[in-house]
Each structure stands twice: as structure tokens, then as C-alpha cells.
Design a protein with these regions (language model features):
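Conserved HGGG/HGGXW glycine-rich cap/lid loop of the alpha/beta-hydrolase fold
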Residues: 6-50
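Active-site loop/oxyanion-hole signature of alpha/beta-hydrolase fold enzymes
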Residues: 37, 45-79, 95-96, 121-123
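Residue in the alpha/beta-hydrolase core beta-strand immediately N-terminal to the catalytic nucleophile
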Residues: 42, 79, 102-105
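Flexible "cap/lid" loop of the alpha/beta hydrolase fold
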Residues: 55, 95, 99-101, 105-146, ...
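Gly/Ala-rich beta-loop-alpha elbow adjacent to hydrolase catalytic centers
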Residues: 81-82, 86, 90
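Active-site nucleophile elbow and catalytic-triad environment of alpha/beta-hydrolase enzymes
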Residues: 162-181
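Short beta-strand/loop motif that positions the catalytic acidic residue
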Residues: 184, 190-192
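Conserved loop-alpha-helix segment in the C-terminal half of the alpha/beta-hydrolase fold
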Residues: 194-221, 225-228, 233, 241
């Protein structure tokens, strides 16, 4: 099944903190089965690249990771999606190469403005907890919370716990520089996972855009990892954005 133009679409799906490209396995398989091209890069210091974790790995590093996928794969007319922290990354990428991005999709993700870091727009209690816990890793990295923190479904929770990796503190602390070019991308979508055992830092972003004509907004009755909890619906939203 192609997109509305009748052609296969190209997707770049960016994961969040403590994760890796592996988290998009279900969604990527669904999209590929419909004839689409899907890239699921793993950010430096995460997943199968966890051996590269270092004090200097920051948000700029991760933006460069994804920019290089576009460069070396010569990607254009891309649906670019980010989950959670990945919203910081895709905002930076899209701002730098807006002419190569056809659509932006935020999957229960941070939606930053110019000059903001993840710490600036997260719930203060979360920020304080992450900084304190980084002390267990020499102040370099934040250990992963359990899957239950994100209300991951019972089937996927054990795998999430097994594969989660410490996340570089500098990536959370670095402020993002945006020119506003990413806002010229006409197709913008936000997906919010509504069921968490605690206050969600992502609901304010959903509330900000849900009635904005420039955005398409969806609320999924699931936890934070929408691509694991509702892969079929996530794939449908991504395909609709193409």
C-alpha cells in the first residue's frame, strides 16, 4: 500500500532516550510490508551503539547522527518521526534540512522551541531525578527507568528493560538552536499516549497543538511507547502523514 500520491514513502524513525532503533521493529515491519522504505537509526551511545557512550555525546551529536543518514542515503521527501527525546532530535534535523523533510511526526515527544533543552521542558521532578541518578555513572549518563515508568505493555516490558541503556546527560542538558525553518514543513502530526501512572510531560505539547489547524493530533489510549503499545495505529498515522 503506497501513500496518497500512489508512491512508496520514505520514513526515518528516531527513538527516544534509553532506547535504540530496535524499538521501531513492529512499526518498521508494517510499513515495509506496505512497500515503504524505512530507516531506524540508533543514536550514538544507545542500543547496539552503547559502547560509544561518552561525556561529549550530546544533542548535537544525535542531530548529526540523523543528518548523516539523510546525507549518505541521499534521502529526500522524508517522513521524519521522533519519539520522546527524539522530538528534540527531529526538530533540530528538520530545522537544518527542511527542504528534505515532507512531514514531521512527534510520537509522544518533546516539542521544543528555540533555546530550550529537554531539561527546560520536562517536568522539574523528572529533571531533578535524572541529574541525581547520573551520579551513579560519574555524572555522564542517566540510568534507564523501568518499563513500568512508561506503562509499557506487559508483552514488551521485559524486552524494554533488557535492552535499555544509560543515556548521555549532556544530550538532555544541551539547548537546541532553531531558526524556525522546521515550522515551514506543512505536514505536522502529534501523537500523545494518554495512559501513564504519573503526570505526563507530553500532554502540554499535545494540548498546545490539538486545536491548531497547522497540526494533526491524535490521542492513543496507551502508555508512552506508542510504537510498541499500538504499532498498527502508529503505522497508520505515519503512513497518513506521507
Amino acid at each position: 500500500m503506497a501513500n496518497s500520491s500512489g508512491k512508496p514513502a520514505t520514513f526515518v524513525l528516531v527513538h527516544g532516550a534509553w532506547s535504540g532503533g530496535w524499538c521501531y521493529g513492529k512499526v518498521a515491519a508494517l510499513l515495509r510490508s506496505r512497500g515503504h522504505v524505512v530507516f531506524t537509526p540508533t543514536l550514538t551511545g544507545q542500543g547496539e551503539r552503547s559502547h560509544l557512550l561518552a561525556a561529549g555525546v550530546n544533542l548535537t551529536t544525535h542531530i548529526t547522527d540523523v543528518l548523516n543518514v539523510f546525507r549518505y542515503e541521499d534521502l529526500r521527501d522524508v517522513v521524519l518521526a521522533g519519539h520522546s527525546y527524539g522530538g528534540m532530535v527531529v526538530s533540530g534535523v528538520a530545522d537544518r534540512i527542511a527542504d528534505r523533510v515532507a512531514a514531521l511526526v512527534y510520537l509522544d515527544a518533546f516539542l521544543p522551541e528555540d533555546g530550550q533543552s529537554l531539561f527546560d521542558i520536562n517536568i522539574p521532578a523528572n529533571t531533578q531525578r535524572f541529574v541525581a541518578n547520573a551520579g551513579n555513572y560519574g555524572g555522564i549518563a542517566v540510568p534507564p527507568p523501568p518499563a513500568s515508568f512508561f506503562n509499557v505493555n506487559a508483552t514488551d516490558a521485559p524486552r524494554v528493560d533488557a535492552l535499555a541503556t544509560p543515556f548521555p546527560l549532556a544530550a538532555m542538558a544541551e539547548r537546541l538552536s532553531l531558526t524556525g525553518a522546521h515550522l515551514t514543513i506543512r505536514k505536522r502530526t502529534y501523537v500523545h499516549g494518554t495512559i501513564l501512572p504519573r503526570e505526563s510531560p507530553f500532554k502540554p505539547f499535545y494540548d498546545r497543538v490539538k486545536d491548531d489547524a497547522a497540526w494533526t493530533a491524535h490521542a492513543f489510549a496507551c502508555g508512552h511507547h506508542v510504537m510498541l503499545d499500538m504499532p498498527e495505529k502508529t503505522a497508520e498515522v505515519l503512513q497518513a502523514a506521507a
